């Protein structure tokens, strides 16, 4: 029936979400429109699972602090530290704070270059993976420009490693707004990056602007 069909596919995920939550299907990497069956489930003890998840976190999110990990896993810092003490973590000083990572086997010592300008999705893991008030990528003065009081996390514009603005697409128009004024050359660099990333998305217009009234 129509009602049954609406319950299968709805704005909250419907049947797709239910199958994903239960561990039956997952999205294909780099292709949000395709799904695959999850590998057979193998249960493990809670303590071992916490260890494995922490290992994955510091491998892919590090350098991260104890506070970051506690925030991400929603565990008390004392409990998180006991888990971290079991890992062969590498300690680093980043922005005056002790942080840790877990390099993958055979990892090169030189990190690859990343683009100077990146358009992050809303609720991006670069923002969710760290305690928001101490995130190295998010200057404190711009916190409320990305994290709203109602729980929304806006798509962020990352410039030279720092969140410098936010962006959205509405009615086939991309608008990127900087949080602080920059010169015309910088605006042009952001616009070219937008054209590079979204040039095949059928946009009618790309607008990169300084904050209103500044």
State each model region's role.
Residues 1-214:
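Long, charged, low-complexity, helical-prone intrinsically disordered regions
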């Amino acid at each position: 029936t129509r009602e049954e069909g609406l319950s299968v596919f709805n704005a909250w995920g419907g049947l797709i979400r239910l199958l994903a939550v239960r561990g039956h299907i997952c999205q294909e990497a780099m292709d949000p429109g395709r799904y695959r069956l999850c590998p057979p489930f193998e249960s493990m003890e809670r303590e071992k699972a916490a260890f494995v998840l922490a290992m994955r976190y510091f491998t892919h999110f590090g350098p991260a602090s104890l506070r970051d990990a506690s925030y991400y896993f929603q565990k008390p810092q004392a409990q998180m530290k006991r888990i971290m003490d079991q890992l062969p973590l590498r300690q680093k000083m980043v922005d005056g704070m002790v942080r840790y990572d877990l390099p993958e086997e055979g990892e090169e010592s030189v990190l690859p270059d990343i683009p100077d300008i990146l358009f992050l999705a809303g609720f991006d893991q670069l923002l969710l993976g760290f305690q928001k008030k101490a995130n190295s990528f998010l200057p404190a003065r711009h916190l409320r420009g990305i994290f709203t009081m109602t729980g929304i996390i806006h798509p962020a514009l990352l410039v030279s490693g720092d969140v410098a603005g936010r962006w959205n697409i509405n009615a086939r128009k991309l608008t990127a707004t900087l949080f602080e004024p920059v010169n015309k050359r910088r605006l042009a660099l952001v616009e070219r990056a937008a054209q590079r990333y979204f040039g095949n998305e059928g946009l009618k217009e790309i607008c990169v602007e300084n904050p209103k009234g500044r």
